[in-house]
């Protein structure tokens, strides 16, 4: 790194620089954020600034995200719209995560795979994945607390299913259509939360082909998945074009 790049890097790591970026973000997104529904809006603004490493920044984010549990829903997904995640360098946007990787592997599987590469990148990946494990523990605790407040059997059953799906993310691969869609929603939310935009869904037919799709409720399950994807559409919208979320599903 030459002297100029070294100085620029140091400046970008300062609170002053990142605060200016945060102010510019909220200014440019004010119209979109004003269109959030009441349950999508955050009651407070907080931020996670880049300091030492990206893995540390992500882990701080995982610890600060406000978890929103919605009773009566088949799936649970949320974005903490009041939590700003600082990116001091350009992001790769308009991309589709490798959902097959997270459906066919648990987080512990991914940690073990990453451990096969003895380099700084694999070390950072392992730190971040362990942070996700801690985040899932928080989610499970929130779901369990929500269950204790309920009396409706159907709502309790739905949340118990969701709790099981989150627990299985830690050490098991997906085994059903519903579980796979919940896992896709969760991992997609991590990209949105960290300021990525135009997060695609990809070849959903190929990704889901391994699961039993001819069950009577499969149409309803997929419909509920679409409804969850539509949540936070104002937050997800790119630029000034409302609805341009990039959540494109490719078939065939």
Predicted regions located by residue number:
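Long, non-catalytic protein-protein interaction scaffolds
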Residues: 1-116
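Mature, well-folded catalytic/scaffold domains that follow N-terminal targeting or propeptide regions
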Residues: 41, 70, 141, 147-252
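N-terminal leader/propeptide and maturation segments of large enzyme subunits in energy/redox metabolism
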Residues: 89-157
């Amino acid at each position: 790194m030459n002297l100029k790049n070294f100085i620029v890097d140091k400046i970008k790591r300062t609170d002053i620089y990142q605060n200016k970026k945060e102010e510019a973000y909220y200014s440019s997104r004010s119209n979109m954020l004003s269109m959030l529904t009441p349950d999508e809006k955050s009651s407070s603004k907080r931020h996670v600034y880049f300091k030492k490493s990206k893995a540390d920044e992500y882990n701080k984010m995982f610890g600060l995200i406000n978890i929103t549990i919605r009773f009566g829903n088949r799936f649970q997904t949320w974005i903490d719209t009041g939590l700003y995640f600082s990116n001091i360098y350009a992001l790769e946007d308009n991309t589709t995560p490798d959902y097959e990787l997270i459906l066919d592997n648990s987080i512990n599987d991914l940690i073990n795979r990453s451990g096969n590469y003895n380099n700084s990148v694999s070390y950072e990946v392992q730190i971040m994945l362990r942070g996700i494990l801690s985040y899932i523990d928080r989610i499970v605790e929130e779901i369990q607390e929500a269950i204790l407040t309920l009396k409706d059997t159907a709502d309790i059953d739905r949340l118990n299913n969701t709790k099981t799906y989150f627990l299985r993310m830690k050490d098991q691969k997906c085994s059903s259509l519903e579980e796979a869609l919940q896992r896709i929603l969760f991992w997609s939310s991590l990209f949105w939360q960290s300021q990525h935009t135009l997060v695609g869904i990809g070849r959903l037919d190929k990704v889901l082909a391994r699961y039993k799709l001819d069950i009577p409720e499969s149409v309803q399950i997929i419909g509920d998945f679409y409804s969850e994807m539509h949540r936070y559409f104002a937050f997800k919208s790119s630029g000034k074009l409302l609805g341009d979320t990039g959540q494109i599903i490719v078939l065939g």
